């Protein structure tokens, strides 16, 4: 890179070695219309990323937006289970159609395409990444205001494919309170920065549990380190969600849309600002 580079590519010639080419995303299905794409990521598994994706879509749907969820976790899909969806996605000459939840949220997942939802998907990375890409190019996302992409944990093939192929407008990182989270979140944040994808902020899940007798907040996993991690990366903490046994029961029953929790309103506000 030239020492005189100003990083303003609009003022330099096409032959400039430091010039950043505009990202070339894959075109969506011709019948699709998606306003904003939000990636929901985590550095490790088991932090409640899929539940966060589902609750965030529900929160935006309650605000009157038409939402969709692209389940990019091909080998560990859980979105259909959370919404109680067990049907098979249908296709016609226009493309493959997602299945709508009770609230009208469009859902596409590998579990809606396989014969038996308990069958494992034993595919190598490039095939999995290709399937995720097809969920964007072949599926009809019709009149969707917010498409949430529930990504598998880590920084492997699928997140790379999503960042390169989809016009991601923002990323929400889901984390847990443990000190180890600082390194894990840093990996996710650094990948987003490398791919030049905007970060909306961090959601801390399993932040605490509320004592049913006295209402005291108990930090099951010890003191939270998310605030300092967020400050280090100049990111807002969008929400701190408790361990909620009732929410867990609703999720297991496929009734997550009936949850009345308002824990993700801050994250919903951050998403809504993208339209303004």
Segments (PLM) and residue ranges:
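C-terminal lobe/tail of nucleotide-utilizing enzymes
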Residues: 1-25, 189-276
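Walker A/P-loop phosphate-binding motif and the immediately C-terminal alpha-helix
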Residues: 31, 36-74, 189
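Residue-level signature of catalytic and energy-coupling elements of molecular machines
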Residues: 34, 45, 71, 79, ...
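Short glycine/serine/threonine-rich phosphate/pyrophosphate-binding segments
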Residues: 49-55, 77-80, 151-159, 180-184
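Phosphate-binding loop that captures ATP/GTP phosphates
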Residues: 66-67, 72-117, 122, 129
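Glycine-rich phosphate-binding loops of nucleotide-dependent enzymes
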Residues: 108, 132, 151, 164, ...
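Phosphate-binding/switch loop-helix module in NTP-utilizing enzymes
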Residues: 114-162
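Conserved Switch II/interswitch segment of TRAFAC-class P-loop GTPases
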Residues: 142-149, 155-156, 167-188
């Amino acid at each position: 890179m030239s020492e005189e580079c100003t990083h303003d590519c609009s003022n330099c010639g096409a032959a400039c070695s430091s010039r950043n080419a505009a990202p070339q995303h894959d075109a969506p299905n011709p019948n699709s219309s998606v306003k904003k794409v939000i990636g929901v990521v985590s550095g490790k598994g088991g932090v409640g990323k899929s539940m966060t994706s589902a609750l965030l879509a529900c929160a935006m749907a309650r605000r009157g937006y038409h939402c969709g969820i692209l389940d990019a976790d091909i080998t560990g899909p859980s979105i259909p289970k959370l919404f109680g969806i067990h049907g098979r996605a249908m296709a016609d000459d226009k493309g493959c159609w997602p299945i709508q939840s009770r609230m009208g949220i469009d859902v596409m997942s590998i579990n809606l395409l396989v014969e038996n939802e308990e069958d494992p998907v034993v595919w190598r990375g490039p095939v999995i990444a290709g399937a995720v890409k097809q969920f964007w190019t072949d599926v009809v996302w019709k009149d969707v205001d917010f498409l949430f992409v529930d990504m598998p944990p880590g920084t492997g093939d699928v997140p790379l494919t999503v960042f390169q192929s989809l016009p991601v407008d923002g990323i929400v990182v889901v984390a847990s309170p443990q000190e180890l989270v600082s390194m894990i979140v840093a990996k996710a944040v650094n990948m987003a920065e490398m791919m030049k994808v905007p970060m909306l902020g961090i959601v801390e899940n399993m932040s605490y549990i509320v004592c049913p007798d006295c209402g005291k907040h108990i930090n099951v996993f010890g003191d939270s380190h998310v605030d300092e991690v967020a400050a280090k990366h100049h990111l807002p903490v969008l929400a701190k969600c408790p361990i909620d046994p009732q929410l867990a029961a609703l999720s297991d029953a496929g009734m997550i849309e009936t949850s009345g929790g308002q824990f993700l309103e801050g994250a919903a506000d951050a998403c809504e600002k993208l339209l303004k």
